[in-house]
Design a protein with these regions (language model features):
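An acidic/histidine-cluster motif and surrounding catalytic segment
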Residues: 1-91, 95-238
Length: 238
């Protein structure tokens, strides 16, 4: 298994990516940083180059090009996994490993190990214990509720890449949905959780038809939460 944490070339991203790496190292996982794609890299061109698809649905997001860049970062690793011979654990920089990692996990093709990071999917512990069995479960929600900790096999990555070639492309977590893929699973209790104080992708809407994306996040303090431009204060940025 190869492990990557998607990291923007920005001091705050490096800081929390290091936290992610350290949390994983405590349980014997070696995680490498993967340089995130940002809007300045023309993410839509990267998506089209990999998939051949030009149909994308990002424009309702507060920052469409940031969401496209997030998808392009994930997609690049999916593409790399599809050509490899072992599973990839793909982490986002604000993921933290807080529960035991299932080193001997047996799963189908693609599974989330991350606690839902948005929406109303976190019930009481008593309800969750009735809803889930310990270990691998069929995905209980319509899509991955955050792509902060996804484990996939090359064969799963291949199917995802192939479908991305002819389906409408949307934000990375909602793209990994049961409508498209019947093999999606989730591990319970979720080993990874998002610990975030800022976002380089999401924000509140400023225009008609745009989505408010901060208010549906879990475990954040909206009074102190920051929205940061991923192309601001980047090292060696021309």
């Amino acid at each position: 298994m190869k492990c990557f944490v998607i990291t923007v070339d920005h001091p705050k991203s490096h800081e929390i990516a290091d936290r992610c790496i350290e949390s994983c190292a405590k349980q014997g996982l070696h995680v490498e940083k993967f340089n995130a794609i940002t809007p300045k890299d023309n993410p839509r061109e990267i998506i089209t180059k990999i998939t051949g698809n030009t149909k994308m649905n990002f424009d309702m997001e507060p920052f469409p090009e940031r969401v496209a860049a997030c998808f392009a970062s994930q997609l690049t690793l999916w593409d790399r996994c599809s050509k490899d011979t072992e599973p990839y654990l793909i982490l986002e920089h604000d993921a933290v490993l807080e529960l035991p990692f299932p080193h001997d996990i047996e799963f189908d093709k693609c599974i989330t190990l991350g606690r839902p990071s948005w929406g109303t999917f976190l019930d009481s512990p008593q309800t969750l214990s009735k809803k889930y069995s310990n270990g691998v479960n069929k995905l209980k929600t319509h899509c991955f509720i955050g792509n902060h900790a996804v484990l996939m096999k090359p064969e799963g990555a291949k199917e995802i890449i192939e479908l991305a070639g002819h389906k409408l492309i949307e934000p990375a977590d909602t793209f990994l949905c049961q409508f498209y893929f019947n093999f999606l699973e989730e591990y319970f209790p979720w080993p990874f959780v998002v610990r975030e104080t800022f976002s380089m992708i999401q924000g509140d809407a400023k225009g008609d038809g745009k989505a408010n994306t901060l208010h549906i996040k879990n475990n954040i303090d909206l009074w102190t939460y920051e929205v940061i431009d991923p192309d601001e204060n980047i090292h060696n940025n021309d």
